[in-house]
């Protein structure tokens, strides 16, 4: 079970040859040993603590303010997180997710719902494969203030530790963009199906952004556009 297995993000349990860099007083930067993206890092908290975003969202802004060539993403504890018991983000190659490659088109059809000023706001993303919100900001203070308002407005089930969500953040010039994707379920029905109907896909931020990861080759080979949409 989760509580019985050694946490693979804690210092004492990581392989000795795992390269690590301390990026601030709270987080390390690790090379992801199982990369999905051409450049792929894991950013675990130095202290073992649950995967919770509310008080840690600012770390995403800080990271891309220093590394504009990367995007950073967050998987909620039941939204694709590989270690729901240890706070972590991931970062990787910027600009290759379908969400990003289509952003110029998507950004032309946003519906603003909360605005701090003409440039900083929360909007609804239309025309994407899944419903989503976007936070557009120019400063860390505005980014965090807008995220807190969105977080508090999102539904949270009684047995969940936070509203279910994935977040993908990147920087474009002076503009910080965070797409927040609300989630209804941890895994699709096809995950629990039997025989040929089964697809072992547990969507995280990358999947919800249009880059579906299939651990089994057989699932990849039988994936269609219609099935891909049903998995999200």
Residue ranges and their predicted role:
Residues 1-59, 70, 82, 94-232:
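Active-site microenvironments that recognize anionic phosphate/pyrophosphate groups
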Residues 75-78, 92-94:
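An acidic- and aromatic-residue-enriched active-site/binding cleft used to recognize and process polar
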Residues 85:
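Histidine-centered nuclease catalytic patch
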């Amino acid at each position: 079970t989760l509580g019985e297995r050694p946490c693979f993000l804690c210092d004492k349990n990581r392989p000795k040859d795992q390269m690590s860099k301390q990026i601030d007083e709270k987080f390390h930067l690790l090379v992801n040993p199982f990369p999905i993206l051409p450049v792929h890092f894991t950013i675990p908290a130095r202290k073992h603590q649950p995967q919770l975003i509310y008080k840690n969202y600012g770390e995403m802004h800080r990271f891309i303010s220093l590394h504009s060539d990367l995007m950073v993403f967050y998987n909620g504890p039941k939204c694709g997180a590989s270690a729901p018991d240890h706070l972590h983000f991931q970062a990787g190659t910027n600009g290759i997710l379908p969400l990003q490659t289509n952003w110029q088109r998507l950004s032309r059809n946003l519906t603003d719902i909360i605005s701090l000023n003409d440039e900083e706001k929360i909007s609804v993303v239309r025309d994407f494969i899944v419903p989503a919100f976007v936070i557009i900001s120019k400063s860390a203070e505005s980014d965090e203030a807008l995220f807190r308002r969105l977080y508090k407005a999102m539904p949270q089930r009684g047995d969940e530790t936070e509203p279910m969500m994935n977040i993908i953040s990147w920087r474009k010039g002076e503009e910080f963009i965070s797409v927040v994707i609300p989630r209804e379920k941890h895994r699709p029905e096809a995950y629990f199906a039997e025989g040929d109907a089964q697809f072992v896909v547990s969507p995280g931020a990358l999947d919800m952004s249009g880059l579906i990861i299939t651990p089994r080759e057989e699932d990849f080979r039988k994936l269609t556009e219609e099935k891909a949409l049903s998995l999200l």
